[in-house]
From Swiss-Prot:
Motif residue range(s): PPLPP motif 1: 488-492
PROSITE patterns listed in its UniProt record: WD_REPEATS_1 (PS00678), WD_REPEATS_2 (PS50082), WD_REPEATS_REGION (PS50294)
Source species: Arabidopsis thaliana
Official protein name in the record: Flowering time control protein FY
Motif (PPLPP motif 2): 632-636
Pfam families per UniProt: WD40
Tagged with keyword Repeat: yes
Biased composition (Pro residues): 548-558, 632-641
Residue ranges of the region described as Disordered: 1-58, 466-558, 593-647
Lineage: Eukaryota, Viridiplantae, Streptophyta, Embryophyta, Tracheophyta
Length: 647
């Protein structure tokens, strides 16, 4: 095959049957298929080139730019007093900083803007949501026992793992960010590394479902609560329980370890909130504030506030320094199922309900600052904040995982209520009550005061503006929907139809001067007492001259089209016609404005080739000195009749 180091240049030798290259789909195709594959080319991926993927619009929320901006800005900012204030314009989005930079203003971190809804192919309830310590991915625990990993910036699917044989009920990361512990309905505990490698499992940790997990500050111990009425403290290294706290008379639904102390709080089906000393294993205190099952308990990062949620639709805040209730939050209409403190603002937290609503609260305010009544179609089982604090994730019984972000400067206020959110083909630009969002007109121009751009009109083809905008003041009357097409706006002053014949000529003369404000030379045959308009007068789109539109050959011009050339026949005769004003500026106005007296003879037409002063006019772009004036072709029709000429 080789001769002198060169490859044989004859016909290519066929490959032996055993060395034939198999395609990626060879498992489904007979090797003796009657269309053999061509020669193998290592530089061409013939299989990958044939795959067609549908282009979809995907929204990405990246916090990198805000962090870079914060690093640049804090070099010269001594404190929050040196921080610049964001202006309510879209251009100010480049100046946004992370949530930690606005520690004195928690309202800047309200994550109520819907971003994305992630859905698994295996439709089942999402019981737990948990961000990775770096915030790059989100891990969800489902009713099917699967871990699903979603990208934390583009929210697309990354990986799915069958982690448990039964529904996952609890997940927690260690503070050193190296291990994750999960529990399921069968009472099994499992240890996971960052790469989702299962390193240890305890299948007899509890007799019933493990409802919640929490690590201590040193990561040497963690606690768990179960429906078997016990709270257990575990040695993390040995994975053995050191003590079992028995004091609840029923299922224990939630547990949380104090941020800095050896103190546990638990809430259960017996409507009690209990405090425990993990060193001695004894109960310290019981709080009897709720009248139904306590579903969630959370310590604040300051270590002094304790937040509890119950099926009685009430959220309570306790201060452990005085062991008294600080505040009750009432706003939910169904069971409060989940709670989450913001990582940067200690007074800001969110809550989820069994009716699918999510409320945003600030300590010191009784009512929710933001309420999203239809965030989910079913119960919100868990809420989790991104470590940076700009994203909120919610897992629900409606099988979806939803992401929420904070608003940018000049965002639509309706976005706060999730009424104009979504970006896919089904939900793009949706608004309540099937109200379609307005689209801006691509043609610039003046529009009716008080209306948006799409509700206004293009001058000359839509609803007319008021003749005197100053007469309306602050009380603008709405325009009826059945109003006929009108003319572009006229300058302030009385309407020409209300003036006498002599005043109409003066008014029309003023309009002709305003139609060419940039011509400093006087128009031909201009009266000597009229001066050219000053150069400081404002220009408006309806004041600019319009080019002449010629009709096609062999057709009559439309009635609304101004004509400045002579036309033979009965329409060109001026026997009994009254002088009329030019129609070029009042296009679309009522016909009575341009017609003469009712008893005047002759057809009501313009004197051809004459303007408002009964003198020849120069039409820009048509009969200027640089163009050769040519008579247009005669329109088809009968010759002029002498009888019509004298009538």
């Amino acid at each position: 095959m080789y001769a002198g180091g060169d490859m044989h240049r004859g016909s290519q030798m066929p490959q032996p049957p055993m060395m034939r290259q198999s395609s990626a789909s060879s498992t489904n195709i007979n090797p003796d298929y009657h269309h053999p594959s061509g020669p193998f080319d290592p530089n061409v991926d013939s299989f990958g080139a044939k795959r067609m993927r549908k282009h979809t619009q995907r929204r990405a929320v990246d916090y990198t730019s805000t962090v870079v901006r914060y690093i640049q800005a804090r070099t010269w900012q001594r404190d929050s007093r040196d921080r610049t204030t964001l202006q309510p314009t879209p251009a100010a989005a480049v100046d946004m900083l992370p949530t930690v930079a606005y520690s004195d203003n928690p309202s800047t971190s309200f994550a109520a803007k819907f971003v994305h809804a992630s859905l698994n192919k295996n439709r089942c309830s999402i019981n737990r949501v948990l961000w990775t310590p770096s915030g790059r991915r989100l891990i969800t625990g489902s009713q099917s026992g699967e871990f699903t990993l979603w990208n934390g910036q583009s929210f697309n699917f990354e990986m799915i793992l069958q982690a448990h044989d039964q529904p996952i009920r609890s997940m927690v990361w260690s503070h050193n960010e190296n291990y994750m512990v999960s529990g399921d309905d069968g009472g099994t505990l499992k240890y996971w590394q960052n790469n989702m490698n299962n390193v240890k499992a305890n299948k007899t940790a509890h007799k019933e479902s493990i409802r919640d997990l929490s690590f201590c500050k040193t990561d040497l111990k963690f606690c768990s609560c179960s429906d078997d009425t016990t709270v257990k403290v575990w040695d993390f290294t040995k994975c053995v329980d050191e003590s079992s706290l028995t004091g609840h008379g029923w299922d224990v639904k939630s547990v949380d370890w104090h941020p800095t102390k050896s103190l546990l709080v638990s809430g259960g089906k017996d409507q009690l909130v209990k405090l425990w000393d993990t060193r001695s294993g004894r109960e310290l205190c019981s709080l009897h504030g709720h009248k139904n099952i306590v579903l969630s308990v959370k310590w604040n990062q300051n270590g002094n506030w304790l937040l509890t949620a119950s099926k009685d639709q009430i959220i309570k805040l306790y201060d452990i320094r005085t062991m008294k209730e600080l505040q009750s939050f009432r706003g939910h209409t169904k069971d409060v199922t989940s709670l989450a403190w913001h990582p940067c603002h200690e007074e800001y937290f969110v809550s989820g309900s069994s009716d699918g609503s999510i409320c945003h609260w600030i300590v010191g305010h009784e009512n929710p600052q933001i309420e999203i009544p239809n965030a989910h179609d079913n119960s919100v089982w868990d809420l989790a904040w991104h470590p940076i604090g700009y994203l909120l994730c919610s897992g629900s019984n409606d099988h979806t995982t939803k992401f929420w972000c904070r608003n940018r400067p000049a965002d639509n206020p309706r976005d706060v209520l999730m009424q104009n959110q979504g970006y896919n083909e089904q939900g793009f630009g949706r608004q309540p009550d099937n109200f379609q969002p307005s689209e801006a007109s691509p043609i610039p121009g003046a529009f009716v005061p008080g209306l948006t751009r799409n509700e206004g009109t293009i001058p000359g083809i839509g609803i007319a503006m008021p003749f005197d905008a100053s007469s309306q003041g602050d009380h603008k009357q709405p325009l009826p929907g059945s109003m006929a097409l009108g003319a572009p706006p006229l300058p302030p002053g009385p309407h020409p139809s209300l003036l006498g014949s002599g005043q109409q000529q003066g008014y029309q003369q003023q309009q002709q001067h305003q139609g060419h404000p940039q011509q400093m030379l006087p128009m031909p045959n201009m009266p000597h007492h009229q001066l050219p308009p000053s150069s400081h007068m404002p220009l408006h789109p309806h004041h600019l001259p319009r080019p002449m539109q010629m009709p096609p050959h062999g057709h009559m011009p439309p009635p609304s089209m101004p004509m400045s050339h002579q036309m033979p026949g009965s329409m060109g005769m001026q026997g009994g016609m009254n002088p009329q004003m030019s129609q070029s500026h009042f296009m679309g106005a009522p016909s009575g404005v341009f017609q003469g007296q009712p008893n005047s003879g002759g057809p009501q037409m313009y004197p051809q080739g004459r303007g408002g002063f009964n003198r020849p006019q120069m039409i820009p772009g048509y009969n200027n000195p640089f163009q050769q004036q040519q008579q247009p072709p005669l329109p088809p029709g009968p010759p002029p009749n002498n009888n019509q000429q004298h009538q």
